[in-house]
Amino acid sequence: MGIRSFRPYTPGTRQATVSDFSEITKSKPEKSLTKYKHRKKGRNNRGVITCRHRGGGHKRLYRLIDFRRDKRDITAQVTAIEYDPNRNARIALVQYEDGEKRYILQPAGLGVGDTIIAGEEAPYEIGNALPLYKIPLGTEIHNIELYAGRGGQMVRSAGAFAQLVAKEGDYVTIKLPSKEVRMVRKECYATIGKVGNAEARNLKLGKAGRTRHLGRRPQVRGSVMNPVDHPHGGGEGRAPIGRSGPVTPWGKPALGKKTRKKKKQSSSLIVRRRR
């Protein structure tokens, strides 16, 4: 993937950068692997806003991604690399020997014509899915299962990878992109390689309109609101917040307050917390 910039015809084009989409080989998605996605716009079942600053955005079709990789010991060939509006990573359309088609996250280095396979005896190659106990130490992996058979839940964003650092008993230890080190059951599957499109983090939106296309609405600072709307609001001109520390619109401590449950069951599997 390359990054394009523009001549400064407008303030928006002066700042913006976009992907050149050079790796995309197919423009329209596979119809059988898409479904309509009803967007919540930050509302719950009663229509009450539960997540602020969400709404609008371009309509999208959801691509059904195979995170489970549960079609075992059957070779598949990559037939296309596609754009997915629901994530920064690219997706690869693969076709199995029996004719079935599926989408997977495109690992860096996987292209059209390459073959992949999932299974305990799968070779050690990019795009193949294996149980963690079969993967050599130091390997870069992604799409990692937390529970065997549930499908990959960790390390799925563009450019992300984790590293296998130890194997002991029924667990393996992995180092996550957040620098957290945690243990996972050895039967859980992971895919070899790192997720492609790592340059996505370097893109600049350049203008408010592109942010709105993504479904994000403006964020208004609490300090410029009225006291009825936010605890930081009110005062004459630029006033301090008038509290010992910043709080949420509902008065709870914000910015630095730990929110993880102290008795969370998975805490026993975390060797080192993220920084």
Curated annotation (Swiss-Prot):
GO annotations of cellular component type: large ribosomal subunit
One Pfam short name: Ribosomal_L2
InterPro entries for the chain: NA-bd_OB-fold, Rib_uL2_dom2, Ribosomal_uL2, Ribosomal_uL2_bac/org-type, Ribosomal_uL2_C, Ribosomal_uL2_CS, Ribosomal_uL2_dom3, Ribosomal_uL2_RNA-bd_dom
UniProt keyword annotations, A-Z: Ribonucleoprotein, Ribosomal protein, RNA-binding, rRNA-binding
Domain of life: Bacteria
Region feature Disordered, mapped onto this chain: 1-24, 208-275
PANTHER family to which the protein is assigned, alphabetical: LARGE RIBOSOMAL SUBUNIT PROTEIN UL2M, RIBOSOMAL PROTEIN L2
Name by which UniProt lists this protein: Large ribosomal subunit protein uL2
The encoding gene: rplB
